From Swiss-Prot:
Chain positions carrying an annotated carbohydrate: 177, 201, 385
Modified residues (Phosphoserine): 322, 332
Residues of the signal peptide: 1-17
Gene: Naga
Disulfide linkage: 38-80, 42-49, 127-158, 187-209
Enzyme class: hydrolase
Lineage of origin: Eukaryota, Metazoa, Chordata, Craniata, Vertebrata
Alphabetized PROSITE patterns for the sequence: ALPHA_GALACTOSIDASE (PS00512)
GO cellular component, one term: lysosome
Protein's recorded name: Alpha-N-acetylgalactosaminidase
Compartment(s) where it occurs, according to its Swiss-Prot or TrEMBL record: Lysosome
Amino acid sequence: MLQKTVLLLALVAQVLMLENGLLRTPPMGWLAWERFRCNIDCVEDPKNCISERLFMEMADRLAQDGWRDLGYVYLNIDDCWIGGRDASGRLIPDPKRFPHGIAFLADYAHSLGLKLGIYEDMGKMTCMGYPGTTLDKVELDAETFAEWKVDMLKLDGCFSSSRERAEGYPKMAAALNATGRPIAFSCSWPAYEGGLPPKVNYTEVSRVCNLWRNYKDIQDSWKSVLSILDWFVRHQDVLQPVAGPGHWNDPDMLLIGNFGLSFDESRAQMALWTVLAAPLLMSTDLRTISPQNMDILQNPLMIKINQDPLGIQGRRILKSKSHIEVFKRYLSNQASALVFFSRRTDMPFRFHCSLLELNYPKGRVYEGQNVFTGDIFSGLQTEVNFTVIINPSGVVMWYLYPIKDLGISTMMSHW
């Protein structure tokens, strides 16, 4: 009964959220920060500095290399773009690095079928020391972003108090809506309040934000990925019910294509973020990404699972003594996704299990597909044991759907 209640509450919570009609599925795109940080040296490093050129080149790659057509449509500027404020108090971009302005970049992105995201901070300064959005500047900055035809705002939380954030984030949401332009709102609010109740009221956050950072910034290492995953798992009973169409928990960017993850770890992050219904925001150099990493990020079935219209966040349902964990996500049309994740550090492990042990209903027969290999299997009965072989720090991921009911039970499966 408790397990059924958890699923019911997740569905009810989605209904109670206030909507601006945006991000009915998790956003997909590219974000500058993890890979390019605050590199503003356009003399020594003109190809990689935070500049108009960088974003135009990434826009070209999104449009020409298949990313846009798979759903990766957001081109998101992060910190270090601001040049200051003009005499009327309006934000202006750095004139040397963004000589044509942000509206020019927005028009360029839109001409390629993309959307432009921008960054500010709910505080006196951004995290890297550029002019922030103080409470008296909220409406002005929202109007400026709308005039520039921006499509998403990421609002950070450095250099502000809890009181200022509690007032400022709802105020910005209202100001964005008042512009009449559809601007998705990415909040860092929960992360600056510890990510958990009672300091974080996720009902309120969900009414204000389309997505929100809950925890620490990701760094280019497997240790960082695991720390974020561990936090999400520890608190999944709080986090899972508040996610849904238009409102997403954000465990931060995808590292795939950078320097810190192995091949298996890259596949693991992609699979785990997908089953968590996380935003798929890449932060890598799309000009030099390897075909192997492109294959991970452009996996059509993976993207289909991430973008499932039900929008139910998955959760860990099994932690075995053999250091194998199983994550499950409910999908539309009675389908589901399973991720078998190995915490082992020795060798590939043969994991034996049955769907019955993973809370699938008795008496059903399933067909499925291995998300990474594409192999299709059929005739898997709930009660029959199967074996998956999982590499250390790797995953096996299945997409499953019932093809037959043997008449024993037709009840909906539960967590």
